[in-house]
A protein has these predicted regions:
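Shared catalytic-loop signature of beta/alpha-barrel
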Residues: 1-114
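Extended hydrophobic packing segments that form well-structured cores
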Residues: 115-147
């Protein structure tokens, strides 16, 4: 099966992708497609086309919590990409409300309210965002390309 959609940013673009039968798995990215409300609309459209959901999620702990909770609320959810060892201080900045079981890498829904995480704001301030790589590509004609 073909999985795609991590760089798709609008409901209309997902509609075109699904209508073309271009994928079997939709990898919408909540941080790119317009947040939880728009992701819900994309998921409903995917379900109408019988397309599974596997949220794309290479971001941090807030995105992970949102992607997991969103996935658990969707009937066509099959798997979620997660990153847990992205930075050595991750456990210092957030207490996550879910556990990844080592056998099978299974995650169960958390039982806490909201996204189920607690953010340590003081610790977050110790690690300001720094862009490692400028994610902008220009073609020889000056057009902006996909990073």
């Amino acid at each position: 099966p073909i999985a795609t959609g991590e760089r798709v940013t609008s409901l209309a673009a997902f509609r075109d992708l699904f209508a073309a039968r271009a994928c079997a798995v939709c990898q919408l990215d909540i941080t790119h497609c317009g947040g939880l409300s728009e992701a819900r609309r994309v998921a409903a459209l995917a379900e109408a086309w019988r397309i599974s959901l596997a949220p794309h999620n290479p971001q941090g702990p807030v995105s992970t919590a949102a992607s997991l909770e969103f996935g658990f609320s969707q009937p066509s959810y099959i798997i979620c990409e997660t990153v847990h060892e992205d930075v050595p201080w991750r456990q210092d900045v957030v207490r996550e409300g879910f556990v990844v079981e080592q056998k099978g890498r299974i995650v169960r829904p958390n039982t806490r309210p909201g996204l189920g995480i607690e953010i340590n704001e003081a610790e977050v301030r110790k690690h300001p965002f720094q862009q490692e790589l400028l994610q902008r590509v220009f073609g020889s004609d000056g057009s902006v390309g996909d990073w």
